[in-house]
Structures are given as structure tokens and as C-alpha cells.
From Swiss-Prot:
Binding sites annotated in the UniProt record for substrate: S76, P77, E78, Y118, E249
Record function comment: With EpmB is involved in the beta-lysylation step of the post-translational modification of translation elongation factor P (EF-P). Catalyzes the ATP-dependent activation of (R)-beta-lysine produced by EpmB, forming a lysyl-adenylate, from which the beta-lysyl moiety is then transferred to the epsilon-amino group of a conserved specific lysine residue in EF-P.
NCBIfam families recorded: genX, PRK09350.1
Residues that coordinate or bind ATP: R100, N101, E102, N109, E242, L243, G298
GO cellular component: cytosol
Protein name: Elongation factor P--(R)-beta-lysine ligase
Source organism of the structure: Pasteurella multocida (strain Pm70)
Length: 323
């Protein structure tokens, strides 16, 4: 009766065995360095304000409550982990499932495994070095090359991303077939050109860390004290994949509140629903999250490189198509 059902795993048993071995090796990497492994909730009262993230939500119906409660599936354990940092956890890491209500395909699955860790008293460069250590251990690859966002953008796009006029960015985006480019804001143009022109050209032979993204793309990173045009944010690229996104973390509660509010302003302009601001994170920041750097790394993409897989479902027991 059920012979035609697609019941078999997405990944081969061989790949699942290799996956388990690599995840165990990742855990050893961090425990050997004295980091505490933590677990935080998958469900939360608060979603995220970031306009670039689409979230899943559900409803908690309690027989003892007067009304149901909306809950959000985690897109990242970041906010909860920062609350632990404020409580005095020290350096921490986590391997967990996260959820993003976005595309599914060769490089994306709505549910995937995230490795996230935080290092009190590390600056951005020291954390880049630790990511490099991890990649060399897991992938046996060449050392990471660190390049500034400004440098790689000028190298491949031919414009200075920090000073180019919007008209120049529009003209360049049109060369790469962005429809109605003149209607997009400056950051959207930068992001389009970076993903379309820069990303395919970096990280082919060795991992590349791109640092000092424009301040307008700071997300939850600090603005550089040496150059206010850039943020202390970095990303890792290797073998055609964006692997990780890291920050010298923003710890100023007032600035964080302002950024959340600006996210909701942008959401309104884009016709997106506004999101409730996570007051518990703000409470932790006010209490004192230590100066730290943190990073989120896509484990499934790391496994794709390690195992030579062409699609993300080849390293997952079950991808979204047969979950």
C-alpha cells in the first residue's frame, strides 16, 4: 500500500556516520578549549526584527491559560546565549537546530543545524583565528585569507562600497540584470553586487574571511572605533558557500534598542509585519553582557564541503522534501 512513499533518508548511511563523527570532533574542539556547551529554547515569546529573516511561528494552547500564546521558532540561539553571558556563563558554544521560513534548495533547508559560540574578551580578529583553527582541523584545508569588504568589492565590482554614489551602484547592478535597480536602496544594491559578483570569486582554494562590512549592515555588531563607516562584522566563504557570520558583539543596550526600532520602521516601509522587540535580551544587555565576539556557522554546509556533497540534503537524514 505504501511502497511508493518516499520513506528513505536523504543522506546515505555512510554520510550519516561521517556526520556523527565530525559533530563529535567539533564538540571536542570546543571542550578541549574550555568552552561550556549549552542548550537554549527552540520556542520563544519573541521573534526577530531583522527584515532579512522570515520566521516560523506556532501557538501554545494551555488548558490553564485564559488565552493562547504565540511562540516563534528560533532562527538563532543568539539572544538566549547572550542572556547566559550576562549571567556569567563564560565562553559558551551550542549545536542546535534553527528554523528559517525561506527557500529550500541545493544550499538551503528551512530546518538546519547551527554551531554558535561566544568568546568574552575576544576581538573580531582573534575569533577569526579560532574559526580558522576549526576549519583547518575539520576540513584539513589551507589557512584562511582575511580580506576587507572594501578591498574585495573594489577588486571584483570596481567601485568603492563606502564612497560610491547610488547612481554608480544602480548602473553597475543593471549590468548584472537587477530589475528596477533604481528603486532599490543603497544597501540592497551593495548586497546584490556582493552576492552576485564578489561571492562567486572568493574562497575557491582556501577559506576567506571578509571583515569590516559597511556600518549600515552592522546587524548586531559594533561599529568600528577606527572607521565609523564600517562595522566589526565578518563572514567566512569557502568552496562557493557562505559558511559563517560573526560579530564583535554590540553590548550597548540603547544602541541595540535603536536598531530594533529601525528594523521595525524598515519592516513597515517594506510592507512586512512588525515584530515585538525582545525585552529580555535588552534586560541582559542593561545588566551587562561582557565585551565579546561571537559567530554562527552552518554545520550542514560545513559537512557539504567535508563530504564533497553537491546538495544540503545529502548530509541530512531527511531534507524538507521528505521530512
Amino acid at each position: 500500500m505504501f511502497e511508493q512513499e518516499n520513506w528513505q533518508p536523504s543522506a546515505s548511511i555512510e554520510n550519516l556516520l561521517a556526520r556523527a563523527k565530525i559533530i563529535a570532533e567539533i564538540r571536542r574542539f570546543f571542550t578541549d578549549r574550555g568552552l561550556l556547551e549549552v542548550e537554549t529554547p527552540v520556542l520563544s515569546e519573541f521573534g526577530v526584527t531583522d527584515v532579512h529573516l522570515s520566521t516560523f511561528n506556532t501557538t501554545f494552547i494551555s488548558p490553564t491559560a485564559e488565552k493562547s500564546k504565540a511562540l516563534w521558532l528560533s532562527t538563532s540561539p543568539e539572544y538566549h546565549m547572550k542572556r547566559l553571558l550576562a549571567a556569567g556563563s563564560g565562553p559558551i558554544f551550542q549545536l542546535c537546530h534553527v528554523f528559517r521560513n525561506e527557500e529550500a534548495g541545493q544550499r538551503h533547508n528551512p530546518e538546519f543545524t547551527m554551531l554558535e559560540w561566544y568568546r568574552p574578551h575576544f576581538d573580531m580578529y582573534r575569533l577569526i583565528n579560532e574559526v580558522d583553527d576549526l576549519l583547518q582541523q575539520i576540513l584539513d584545508c589551507k589557512p584562511t585569507e582575511s580580506l576587507s569588504y572594501q578591498f574585495v568589492f573594489q577588486e571584483y565590482v570596481g567601485l568603492d562600497p563606502l564612497s560610491a554614489e547610488k547612481a554608480e551602484l544602480v548602473a553597475k547592478a543593471k549590468q548584472y540584470h537587477l530589475q528596477q535597480a533604481e528603486q532599490e536602496d543603497r544597501d540592497t544594491l551593495l548586497q546584490f553586487l556582493f552576492s552576485t559578483v564578489v561571492e562567486p570569486n572568493i574562497g575557491k582554494e582556501n577559506p576567506v574571511a571578509v571583515y569590516h562590512f559597511p556600518a549600515t549592515q552592522a546587524a548586531l555588531a559594533q561599529i568600528s572605533s577606527e572607521d565609523h563607516r564600517v562595522a566589526e562584522r565578518f563572514e567566512f566563504y569557502y568552496k562557493g558557500l557562505e559558511l559563517a557570520n560573526g560579530f564583535h558583539e554590540l553590548t550597548d543596550v540603547n544602541e541595540q534598542l535603536h536598531r530594533f526600532e529601525q528594523d521595525n520602521v524598515q519592516r513597515q516601509k517594506m510592507g512586512l509585519p512588525q515584530r515585538q522587540i525582545d525585552k529580555r535580551l535588552l534586560g541582559a544587555l542593561q545588566a551587562g553582557v561582557p565585551n565579546c565576539s561571537g559567530i554562527a556557522l552552518g554545520v550542514d554546509r560545513l559537512l557539504m564541503i567535508a563530504l564533497g556533497a553537491n546538495a544540503i540534503h545529502e548530509v541530512m537524514a531527511f531534507g524538507i522534501e521528505n521530512a
